[in-house]
């Protein structure tokens, strides 16, 4: 983990920049770490073809474009914490049929999310279904069908 040098503006948690997902996990409080790991394992097991990368200091998962991300509440964006747990989000949720009302839109046009403090069997089922649908949309978009 490295500190951002002075003079650079950052919206990352406390000016920290994580080099790996494992550094991020080490930074998180125990409950958030466990939930993030559980969601991460769910995404990887359901969609092993997705590539994991860090962006904005949180894990994003990409096929052709970004499909989803996990945003632990302890990784601050905009200067203050606005939810608890971990946010699971589809980056193009507006194109994925059946997302709402499980995922929320808030005031966003494109990204839809759900804030989780635990994963129930119904959450797991919905996340698996939504990941498959989001990957289908991503494949269609990569072929110019959407």
Where would I find each of the regions flagged by the language model?
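Charge-dense, helix-prone N-terminal extensions
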Residues: 1-146
């Amino acid at each position: 983990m490295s500190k951002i040098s002075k003079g650079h503006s950052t919206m990352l948690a406390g000016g920290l920049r994580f080099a790996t997902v494992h550094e991020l996990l080490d930074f998180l409080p125990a409950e958030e770490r466990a939930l993030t790991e559980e969601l991460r394992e769910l995404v990887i097991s359901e969609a092993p073809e997705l590539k994991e990368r860090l962006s904005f200091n949180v894990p994003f998962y990409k096929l052709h474009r970004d499909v989803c991300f996990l945003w632990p509440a302890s990784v601050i964006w905009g200067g203050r914490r606005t939810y608890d747990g971990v946010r699971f989000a589809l980056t193009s949720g507006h194109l994925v049929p059946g997302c709402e009302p499980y995922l929320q839109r808030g005031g966003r046009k494109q990204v839809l999310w759900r804030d989780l403090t635990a994963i129930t069997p119904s959450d797991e089922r919905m996340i698996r279904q939504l990941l498959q649908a989001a990957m289908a949309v991503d494949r269609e978009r990569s072929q110019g069908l959407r």
